Structures are given as C-alpha cells and as structure tokens.
C-alpha cells in the first residue's frame, strides 16, 4: 500500500514486547504511533529502531507550549525523521504557525504537522469543567479552522466530526481519527467511536487503532481484515 490508512498505536511499557509485536507486522500495511509513555521510557532511539525496520512513525507527543519552545520541539521531531507530529491546537494560532514555519527548510521531507482538537475521551461535561461552553463539535471546528489558518496539514478528530470538517475545511485537510474499534471490539476508554470503514466513509484519512491490533493473537491477520474493509 502506497499510503496505508491504519496507524497502529504502540502502548507498551516493555521494549522487548513492543519489538516482538512490531516484528509480526509488515511496514507496507500500516504506520506506527509512538506516544508519551513509550517516548519517555525509550526515547528517540526507539523511533530510530522502528525506522530501521521500515516503518513510518507518527510521534504523538501533543506539544503545547510558547511558540518558540513548541516550534523547537517540532524541529527536533523533523530531525528524527518522523512521518507525522502533532501539537495542541488550543495552544493558539501563533504557536501553530511558528511550528509550521520551522519545518519549511525540510521541504518535501518534512513531517506532516497535525493539530489536536478535542481529545476523544472528552464529552460536553468535561469541556464545561474547563470553561468551554461550546458543544464538542463546535469547539472542534473552531480549533480545526485555527489549525488550517496556521498552515497545518490537518487535525486529530473523532470520526463523528470528520464529515463536518471535510465540508468546512476541504478534502486536502488531513483528518486523523483515534477511537476506532473494528466491529466486535471492546470500547476501552475512547468515548466517541466508529468502525474503520464507517470512519473512512465519514471523511477520515488515517485511523489510529491500538489494542484491537496489538492484543490480537495474529495482528497481521487483523490488519489485513481492516485494510480489506477499507477498499
């Protein structure tokens, strides 16, 4: 596959277990997401190890800081050679624009820069608790519009928001969707969920899937089934 849609979320606290899983799957069938836990435990060397094995990596560290600090972190991700990196859109337009600008020298080799809108675990009551009175969907659209204006390539959003965002922000604006569970999977701690085929039909470009693949006895088979359902 030239542009695999599935991004497998690696959530391991043991390096040997993570690499044992990775060695069961084919880099042409998916990409890999490295988040805060694994990056804190194993650092950039783990990402390099995945690159050596032929995988594209989404570095999911959700940077959120003053523009200068955030942009330098994004530059460090570009130096590491990752395929995608993200920042919190709630950091504001100046922070996002600085992060996008610092990637200019990398040209076509630069990572995709993605904004994080509303975490998929958050519901209206959670937003109200931090003083945001808008409905989740309205707040997502506001933050995603800000991200597009700042020059970002796309946003992380739930599948429920995908069609709305494509409609408002255009086909080229990439939508990365977590909270994806193949039919029959456990819901876990993601509140707003959909199956892979439903999410792609709704406008998602990339699907983040974790435990249904990483905890499967035969992850390569599960990946094949998911990819087949997207054709």
UniProtKB/Swiss-Prot annotation:
Primary enzyme class: lyase
E.C. numbers: 4.1.1.23
Annotated protein name in UniProt: Orotidine 5'-phosphate decarboxylase
Keywords carried by this UniProt record: Decarboxylase, Lyase, Pyrimidine biosynthesis
Catalyses which reaction(s): orotidine 5'-phosphate + H(+) = UMP + CO2
Cellular component, GO annotation: cytosol
PROSITE patterns per record: OMPDECASE
Subunit note: Homodimer.
InterPro entries, A to Z: Aldolase_TIM (IPR013785), OMPdecase (IPR014732), OMPdecase_AS (IPR018089), OMPdecase_bac (IPR047596), OMPdeCOase_dom (IPR001754), RibuloseP-bd_barrel (IPR011060)
Keyword Lyase: yes
Taxonomic classification: Bacteria, Pseudomonadati, Pseudomonadota, Gammaproteobacteria, Vibrionales
Pathway: Pyrimidine metabolism; UMP biosynthesis via de novo pathway; UMP from orotate: step 2/2
Family statement: Belongs to the OMP decarboxylase family. Type 1 subfamily.
Binding-site residues for substrate, renumbered to this chain: 11, 33, 60-69, 120, 181, 190, 210-211
HAMAP family for the chain: OMPdecase_type1_B
Function: Catalyzes the decarboxylation of orotidine 5'-monophosphate (OMP) to uridine 5'-monophosphate (UMP).
Active site: 62 (proton donor)
GO molecular-function terms, A-Z: orotidine-5'-phosphate decarboxylase activity
The gene coding this protein: pyrF
């Amino acid at each position: 596959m030239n542009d695999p849609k599935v991004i497998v979320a690696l959530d391991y606290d043991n390096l040997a277990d993570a690499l044992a899983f990775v060695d069961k799957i084919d880099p042409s069938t998916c990409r890999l997401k490295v988040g805060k836990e694994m990056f804190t435990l194993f650092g950039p060397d783990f990402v390099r190890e995945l690159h050596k094995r032929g995988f594209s990596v989404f570095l999911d560290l959700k940077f959120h800081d003053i523009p200068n600090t955030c942009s330098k972190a994004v530059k460090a991700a570009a130096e590491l050679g990752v395929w995608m990196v993200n920042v919190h859109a709630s950091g504001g337009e100046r922070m996002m624009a600085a992060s996008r600008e610092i990637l200019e020298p990398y040209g076509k080799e630069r990572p995709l820069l993605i904004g994080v809108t509303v975490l998929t675990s958050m519901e209206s009551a959670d937003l109200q608790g931090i003083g945001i009175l808008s409905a989740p969907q309205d707040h997502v659209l506001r933050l995603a519009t800000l991200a597009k204006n700042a020059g970002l390539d796309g946003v992380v959003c739930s599948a429920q928001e995908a069609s709305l965002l494509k409609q408002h922000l255009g086909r080229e604006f990439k939508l990365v969707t977590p909270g994806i569970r193949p039919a029959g999977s456990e819901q876990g701690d993601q509140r707003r969920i959909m199956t892979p085929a439903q999410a792609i039909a709704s406008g998602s470009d990339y699907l983040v899937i974790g435990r249904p693949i990483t905890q499967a006895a035969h992850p390569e088979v599960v990946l094949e089934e998911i990819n087949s359902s997207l054709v």
